[in-house]
Amino acid sequence: MKSTFEAAGRVAKGMLKDPSKKYKPFKGIQLPNRQWPNKVLTKAPRWLSTDLRDGNQALPDPMNGQEKLRYFKLLCSIGFKEIEVGFPSASQTDFAFVRHLIETPGLIPDDVTISALTPSREPLILRTIEALRGAKNATVHLYNACSPLFREVVFRNSKQETLDLAIKGSKIVTAATKNALESKETNWGFEYSPETFSDTEPDFALEVCEAVKGMWKPSAAQPIIFNLPATVEMSTPNTYADLIEYFSTNISEREKVCVSLHPHNDRGTAVAAAELGQLAGGDRIEGCLFGNGERTGNVDLVTLAFNLYTQGVSPNLDFSKLDEIIRITEDCNKINVHPRHPYAGNLVFTAFSGSHQDAISKGLKAYDERKAVDPVWKVPYLPLDPHDVNSEYAAIIRVNSQSGKGGVAYLLKTNCGLDLPRALQVEFGSIVKDYSDTKGKELSIGEISDLFYTTYYLEFPGRFSVNDYTLSSNGPQSKCIKCVVDIKGEKKDTPSRVVIEGVGNGPLSALVDALRRQFNISFDIGQYSEHAIGSGNGVKAASYVEIIFNNTSFWGVGIDADVTSAGLKAVMSGVSRASRAFAK
């Protein structure tokens, strides 16, 4: 079966070598004294969620009544005060849902305004008002397309006919709402969209909106909403901002007007367009959670909110339970949030790169040390503290063949309590990289800790291990050790056991002397460090010892409830690793 385009002779051929023959650049307006580039965002806009209307109509499987109600409750819990609840004149499901919201006590919070969209046609306008009647606060959202393309190709209307359509619709809305006795129990608002605004002649858009305003007669206390959509994103964000500033500075009675922005994301810059549009005079933004909507989506309200939040400006929306919000959104929309989605994707707080991991690890440590006196968040690669959205730092660093020592060390410290010396981080980081290369996949923290315990003989003994020992003094600065050592051969049989003795200025040097005497093994101890793991009765000691054998460094690790035993185990761990390396 042929597609619509094929049936019309529109067969795919590929990209043109000279696209200028087919596509023309968007022409902006001349605004030589534009003011928006000199401004900064210092407060949140009014937000409207259109998930239940613009978002829902774009879903392959639109939400049913139960899903809509679940989503509405989610939006209220986040803090949205304006919610577009549907297109009741076009859908009986939407009509029934709006009536259910209004007729069920307590579903709509007193401070929440619901709105519904309607074309500028009398039967549809009246049906929409019928759906909204009885709500405490309701906005009728009227629209008609005004751009040349839609006037000439879609509707075949002149400018005057387009203007008359907007005026007629506004008269009907006014008569049936704030001027109607049966509608007095509702606080009515009015929103008008010159649809396809960004492709409409700016002066014509102003002319239409002035006429609509004259019908509604707004006040400063109850302004009319002029929603200025980039119905299809056709230009760079600065061009949209110019259009908004031109409209905002030229509409009369500006104090009686709320300028609302409604960018779509066809060029991938809806967020930027919304932010620049705010600088240019926008008071309100319409969009969807995670950018749902027609084609490439509406502007993403989550990204906009966190962009403000991470600049120290409260968005007046609460996304603390972001994982739960994502889960409900995915359940209702049946579309997954992309793993790279700003702020919300399951990989946005994740670093695989070694250099990134090292910087994050150091940044988190520095922040933890200074946050009591300087709480300002400054951590490389993380514009948002994961704790602010109930996420854990443990999820930040994940390990594959691209990872480095810093990430591996961070995971071992946060999950196992092991604070590796830098040189040991380098050694084990290389081991992890080789192991991940062999496996060809990301390693879990369980796999990393298992590899660490196996490599350094913490789970099972290496070739040499201490079975028992006694220490005695041989003068004020000398220790004698008598140590029972198990020696494991190549075959997995019972290890042989010998008693060795040595003298040194401490337990570790005494063990080194004993190994040299018994086995003719000559090596030095390089770096040594230790720290406690845990606290209280269950505290253990972790010891790290660098063995220098034939000018080669081998690290050993020991963990024990006794500090001395941990150090001796670390020496044997290093010696076992050295003997294994040189036996190959």
Curated annotation (Swiss-Prot):
Pfam families: HMGL-like, IPMS_D2, LeuA_dimer
One GO BP annotation of this record: L-leucine biosynthetic process
Keywords: Amino-acid biosynthesis, Branched-chain amino acid biosynthesis, Leucine biosynthesis, Metal-binding, Transferase
SMART domains: LeuA_dimer
Annotated pathway: Amino-acid biosynthesis; L-leucine biosynthesis; L-leucine from 3-methyl-2-oxobutanoate: step 1/4
Domain (Pyruvate carboxyltransferase) ranges: 45-323
Catalysed reactions, as listed in the record: 3-methyl-2-oxobutanoate + acetyl-CoA + H2O = (2S)-2-isopropylmalate + CoA + H(+)
GO cellular component, one term: mitochondrion
GO molecular function terms attached to this record: 2-isopropylmalate synthase activity; metal ion binding
Enzyme Commission number(s) from the entry: 2.3.3.13
Record: residues binding a divalent metal cation: D54, H262, H264, N298
Top EC class for this record: transferase
Similarity annotation: Belongs to the alpha-IPM synthase/homocitrate synthase family. LeuA type 2 subfamily.
Family matches, as PANTHER family: 2-ISOPROPYLMALATE SYNTHASE, PTHR46911
Entry function: Catalyzes the condensation of the acetyl group of acetyl-CoA with 3-methyl-2-oxobutanoate (2-oxoisovalerate) to form 3-carboxy-3-hydroxy-4-methylpentanoate (2-isopropylmalate).
Summary of subunit composition and partner proteins: Homodimer.
HAMAP family for the chain: LeuA_type2
Protein name: 2-isopropylmalate synthase
Protein species of origin: Schizosaccharomyces pombe (strain 972 / ATCC 24843) (Fission yeast)
Lineage, opening ranks: Eukaryota, Fungi, Dikarya, Ascomycota, Taphrinomycotina
Encoding gene, per UniProt annotation: leu3
